[in-house]
């Protein structure tokens, strides 16, 4: 119950405030008709009700998503599964993001009465823990495919990154106290890389925060591809099921980016509930995939009972469980499929850059993520004002429809790619 309560608090990170655009040059004042004022009042009331409903639903779904994730970790880390230790640590490290988001969300609400999504410096720091998780998972798979397993260096790097994320928040707080200036929208890492004189809503994500989001999407796709490749290399097809299990979580990331792309618009508050739903579904599919993997590796219900009894004894009597020795699966020679050799998708970057050092590999991912961040952040401000005005008056239905396309199209393409890749001898002729 305590863990669920904490996750319900984390759902506060998905509350919304209305985006406020920066002031434009002085324009002649116009009289506003009374019926327009009445319509605006009704719209705001409807958006507020939708936001409250979405928040409540998201809180329940986020809370429900913890149990399947813990179940997934149990089967993943079971000695019989013989999963790469770096991957085990990476997926466990995700809990740092989950519980790191809680104080960030509470801080945004307590300090500014805003959502975490609208407090960039807290938002970026918290989300960076998710990006770090994905990096560790990718590096864990790279190590396993290279025939080595060194989780200690990954633990050290992840610990340093967590410290950096916390330090970045303290730097903003210290600067705040010195200037006595409220910083609800203070950019994370001082907005390094932001372009000046660009007309954006005040709650637009900074470049560093956008890079964190785009890198998370790219890294997760790369991890999906590496899991698929790992299945071929060790001759265990159940790892391909893990790739399928990861797919809803990638869609969850797309939903989050879509919401930020539209500047956290109140009429798109359904994105928060959808993101929570995709997270809960993804955690469940991941748990099922790991269950299949564990069963194929020899896990039985009697193992589960023994582990439960050992855990109970450890909690009540302080009895330490005996450490079970694990063996690293032997690598087998497997001819990559034609889709893998063609290197057509983001997920194939792991194979394309397999010979790079970790530093060079991550540097390439960072450069790619930065390019995508600039693209999504600064393309909307380039749209002519007449089109922007027309869009503003198009109505909530049009806005929701456009957001739905941003979410559904890449998700369907992702599903199509993995479906065609799973067909024997099939060759995918597209990209995401």
Predicted regions and their residues:
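Long, compositionally biased alpha-helical segments
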Residues: 10-12
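Active-site histidine-anchored catalytic micro-motif
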Residues: 15
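N-terminal plastid-targeting presequences
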Residues: 21-432
